[in-house]
Amino acid sequence: APFILFVRAKPRIKDFMSEAENHMIEAPEALPQVQNLDEIHPDQNPSAYNESSIQILEGLEAVRKRPGMYIGDTADGSGLHHLVYEVVDNSIDEALAGFATHIEVTIHTDNSVSVVDDGRGIPSAIKWDDKHDPKRSAAEIALTELHAGGKFDNNGYKISGGLHGVGVSCVNALSSWLRLTVRRDGEARFLEFRKGLVQNRIVEQLPNPLTGKLENVSPMKLLGPTNRRGTEVHFLPDLTIFEKVTQFSYDTLLSRLRELSFL
């Protein structure tokens, strides 16, 4: 069955897109000559590449440190709008798999964007094989780990539009705040993040069904019963990341989403 994809703005936001300025860099006439490389001590050479140059970035640190590697240009607006496409791609995959018929994208007056679908909802139960302490919900892992999701095991999605870069975890990392609401199995559950970090974490002890031992777990906040299903992602881009173009363009999103609705 065909699915419906809506785009709306509150109110309509003007397109502030502008072309990025071109910058020319003059090459030096001649490169400096080094007589003996052995004479340069690594600690005294600012361009030295050695073991101290290798950094280990945990979680979503890498995305915030080098956002352009994950979403493209953060100055010309393409990276900003790519955040929306990453979230929408997940909803479209639910539609391609036959589980969603409706996707709604809203630009809010504060320049935040929400994407709501009526798919199965991101799994919200505790992932008992999680190595983290406390053990986290599957939804939290999907939003805070770069290479986590439901498209790696060949079971969750028999049909998929692809992995779509690094998905919603990248959006989470580059947002001032992100609010996730999952409606699944008759319950609505909620998580809030700021710059990729979960807020107001709930920690309790439950018996691990795999081992029988009591373990610390961090479930999503229970909002209550619901007869709806699906995933809602509402986020506000972090303007310390995005430089010149900081407002979403209704026309840019409309054009892209109109194309996607026919694919």
Residue positions per predicted region:
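Conserved ATP-binding N-box helix of the HATPase_c
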Residues: 77-101, 167-174
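GHKL-type ATPase core
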Residues: 16-53, 111-138, 149-263
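Mobile ATP-lid/nucleotide-binding loop of the nucleotide-binding subdomain
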Residues: 145-146
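Short, Lys/Arg-enriched N-terminal segments with co-localized hydrophobic residues
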Residues: 1-16
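A conserved short beta-strand within the histidine kinase catalytic ATPase domain
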Residues: 101-107
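Short basic (Lys/Arg) and small-residue
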Residues: 142
